[in-house]
Regions:
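Charged alpha-helical initiation segments
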Residues: 1-15
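Secondary-structure edge/capping motif, primarily at the C-terminal ends of alpha-helices
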Residues: 1-2, 30, 106, 140
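OB-fold ssDNA-binding interfaces and closely related basic DNA-contact patches used
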Residues: 9, 20-25, 148
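Aromatic- and histidine-enriched alpha-helix N-cap/loop-to-helix transition segments
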Residues: 11-18, 94, 121-128
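Short non-catalytic regulatory patches outside canonical folded cores
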Residues: 21-97, 104-109
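Substrate-binding/catalytic groove segments of enzymes
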Residues: 94, 103-116, 137-148
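Amphipathic, Lys/Arg-enriched alpha-helical patches that create a basic surface
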Residues: 118-163
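Acidic, Ser/Thr-rich low-complexity intrinsically disordered segments
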Residues: 158-178
Length: 178
């Protein structure tokens, strides 16, 4: 059913990806107090410069044998513009690129797939984007915990009913967030 699409999936997909945008900005500001970006490329640079393995993290869907790498291939390059400023260009996950096509060109027919973009608001992309939001929020939560509550190692209190993410090498535990 990964290809199943609906109007409800469009709403969920847009809400999830919008929330990624909303969460990423203050998270990057928490990581770098001088952060001023507001685009996915700026978030990519900020997060992956600190967490080199962020894009390689696997999120597991509980009660199913499904693993997702929601930020797979998330990387960036920089180029110097004629005005002397650095421009960050990111290679974004497929689900983010699809989200933007649905957001801006919903009824346009994809040359590649011969489908209108809204039909790509499917179960697969909703699940990938939700796993990406889970990972982003988990990293943000961990950063806040380490900064403001470093002695409280019992956080979070409630496990997620949907996802798990192992963050090895830093804490060596399974962090599970509701």
């Amino acid at each position: 059913n990964f290809r199943a699409y609906s109007n409800e999936y469009i709403k969920q997909y847009q809400a999830i990806c919008s929330e990624i945008d909303v969460v990423a900005k203050p998270y990057c500001k928490e990581l770098n107090s001088n952060f001023k970006g507001n685009k996915i490329s700026a978030y990519c640079k900020c997060i992956t410069d600190i967490y080199l393995d962020f894009a390689n993290r696997r999120v597991n869907l509980q009660e199913r044998e499904i693993s997702k790498f929601p930020w797979k291939n998330w990387s960036y390059t920089t180029e110097l513009q004629s005005n002397g400023k650095e421009k960050v260009i990111s290679n974004n996950p497929d689900w983010w690129q699809t989200y933007n096509k649905i957001k801006h060109n919903r009824t346009t027919v994809s040359n590649e797939m011969q489908l209108p973009y809204y039909k790509l608001a499917n179960q697969k992309n909703v699940l990938h984007s939700l796993a990406a939001l889970f990972q982003l929020e988990l990293y943000y939560f961990r950063t806040l915990q380490q900064t403001y509550f470093p002695t409280d190692t019992d956080m979070p209190d409630s496990p997620s009913k949907l996802f798990t993410l192992k963050i090895g090498g830093i804490l060596g535990l399974y962090w599970i967030v509701a």
